[in-house]
Amino acid sequence: DETLEDLFDELTFEISEEKKQNCVKHIRYILGYQNFSGSSRIKTKDGRPWSRETFMDEIGIKVCPYCNRQYITSYSVSPEGKRIRKTTTDTAHYYPVSKFPFLSMNIHNMVPSCQICNSRLKLDKVSCKSDAHLYPYMDPSSSLEFQIPFSDVPQLYAFSEEDIHICLKGSEGVEKRAEQSKKIFRLEEVYETHRDIVYRLKNEIRDYSREEYNKIFCENYTDLFGGYDRFIEVLHPFLAEDEKNTPLTKMKKDIYFYLKENCAVLY
């Protein structure tokens, strides 16, 4: 027996590409996507235009959830005294509008992202379930973990910045989608740019995990910081930062805790 998907494939096979694209345009127009991305005539309950900028304000994140490298923010401009909201954000459709036009205005299909991840890397690559990458609304950020493989403690202390290789590992149960995210968004490749940050973190771990530093702190600075845990947060401010609002926080936290778990040299 033919499945609904098989029947749909047979149906669309008879439709020319030009007609399919015209159909997509009409569906997007009916659903109001052009207004959403431009000057929206649809209003929210409090009277604001329902637009990409409003959606971004409601989501309330400042960093791209796909890469955690780029800020995505909204701002206001006032030409001729009229306040207008703008945004640096792309509205990435998890399932692309070109293939799933009926999902163009479904907020569960709209993911705020940076232009690099959406317009240069993702594009229309997710066309079916087997292509699916991690879904930010359901998959936690821990679905992908940054690591820097090394064999022993002396190697950790000895490696140079050029030796650093940043890799990502998918967590159990989401390995396939995690691998797709790595592939689509080129995460391991683009994060090679940040080897200097990992190298600096490694040096801080090496320098401040020594017993003599712990002793000096306990004897002289406990009152200043209110405790050793607070001292660690001052030394590594990313530990107290929210990765939804600060770029590169996920990489820093993952590497820090990876070293803490795999190497008995941390504080």
Language-model features, listed with the residues they occupy:
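Extended, Lys/Arg-enriched charged tracts that mediate electrostatic binding to polyanionic substrates
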Residues: I59-P65, I72-S74
